[in-house]
């Protein structure tokens, strides 16, 4: 008795052999090991850029509100001490108009605290005992005494050391004119703590 095979069917079972599967897994593991450090770096850069951009957004909101309302607008750390703990943007409408947040002031924006692995340092009015950034009705960066107030804030990862610290730092520079920009000190020679644009 002879068996007839159906046309179009082979006698070999469909699927992968164990060797083919092991080679595929080995190649995938090698590719993952090569890509993982790049992914971590990309994630860190993304978080850092997002924090710097959030600060610039707050600065631009304050400047825009100051020009729109014809009043001083201020950016202050939420806890009145550290920029890392978040910041509040408000229009100084109170009778004192002293650059501090009062009940009668208009809160425009609030930023929650940054992640614990960020460190923020500052110069200019942003580094005073009670730090602040103030913009007048023309959009200029001002001090409480009425002078021009250029300032710089550096946002860096505090969980790194060595050469990677420079790569993982962003500076927000606010010029006398009130214009804010973000730069990376490791690649931009004009990105200094004393830059006043």
What are these regions (language model features)?
Residues 1-13, 22-25, 30-60, 64, ...:
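N-terminal helix-rich module
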Residues 19:
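Residues within the helices of the helix-turn-helix
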